């Protein structure tokens, strides 16, 4: 396998299971390597050979559009043989356990497995059973490390830094793996983090993660450099956490009036998929302060960087 990226960064981990456990040097190295791939992806020839001869399996137990397609594009641009396995094609639907699925896949000697699962900790369980490297593409409400990395890259490219910025994360924090990974990363990189949500959508003891807490948008967005909106994850809700979508939007949905509570040059982010008219309106989502489309672009570059960094640790690298 030959590497084509200029950076000599090597991630000191066999897997990427979460932001927790990464050092500031790890995060910075991945962001710097991602910058190289941002430039590559804007060229006509986007191909590199750093994963040539390697097999990448995308194992998605939850439906995904952005993340799965982004990992597929990332692997193919680096020259990997990429296989996608979705919920409908997995033998777990026939009663096979996750451990048996892992052992079956391991017998085929994949080099990199990218996995999404509805259960927190499922990706770590898989990682203990396979010989290749494993990337967490989201596990329950636990972590989504590549989303946090692409968000950090987007912020750094637009604000020039992460240190000292105030990032307001608004919405369904309780069920959000994106919020958790972003909180860990942003705190590590010196940003201030404020979570904004009704009490029913805040995890107990969230303050222990080193965040400020606000329960209304006026207080929550005051002085914010970045406003990061989260959707209501109804698929993870077992009861009624909000009275109605319309009432939720009235109090916590981001529109121009509420955005004015933040700094005049504040930028808006959303990990997707968006529920327009629930947590964000179209004028803001499509407006000049929105970075939402840029986040999607950064996702491919970040996932290329992660795949390459892990591949450099493989025995045949």
UniProtKB/Swiss-Prot annotation:
EC number(s) from the headed UniProt entry: 2.1.3.2
GO terms (BP aspect): 'de novo' pyrimidine nucleobase biosynthetic process; 'de novo' UMP biosynthetic process; amino acid metabolic process
Known pathway: Pyrimidine metabolism; UMP biosynthesis via de novo pathway; (S)-dihydroorotate from bicarbonate: step 2/3
Positions annotated to bind L-aspartate: 94, 177, 231
A GO molecular-function annotation: amino acid binding
Keywords tagged on the record: Pyrimidine biosynthesis, Transferase
Pfam families, alphabetized: OTCace, OTCace_N
Gene Ontology, cellular component aspect: cytosol
Keyword match Chaperone: no
Enzyme class of the recorded protein, top EC level: transferase
Reaction(s) the record says it catalyses: carbamoyl phosphate + L-aspartate = N-carbamoyl-L-aspartate + phosphate + H(+)
Keyword 4Fe-4S: no
Record-listed carbamoyl phosphate binding positions: 66-67, 116, 144, 147, 272-273
InterPro entries linked: Asp/Orn_carbamoyltranf_P-bd, Asp/Orn_carbamoylTrfase, Asp/Orn_carbamoylTrfase_sf, Asp_carbamoyltransf, Asp_carbamoyltransf_Asp/Orn-bd
NCBIfam families named in the record: asp_carb_tr, PRK00856.1
Subunit description: Heterododecamer (2C3:3R2) of six catalytic PyrB chains organized as two trimers (C3), and six regulatory PyrI chains organized as three dimers (R2).
Protein family: Belongs to the aspartate/ornithine carbamoyltransferase superfamily. ATCase family.
Function as written in the Swiss-Prot or TrEMBL entry: Catalyzes the condensation of carbamoyl phosphate and aspartate to form carbamoyl aspartate and inorganic phosphate, the committed step in the de novo pyrimidine nucleotide biosynthesis pathway.
Protein name listed in UniProt: Aspartate carbamoyltransferase catalytic subunit
Native source organism of the sequence: Nitrobacter winogradskyi (strain ATCC 25391 / DSM 10237 / CIP 104748 / NCIMB 11846 / Nb-255)
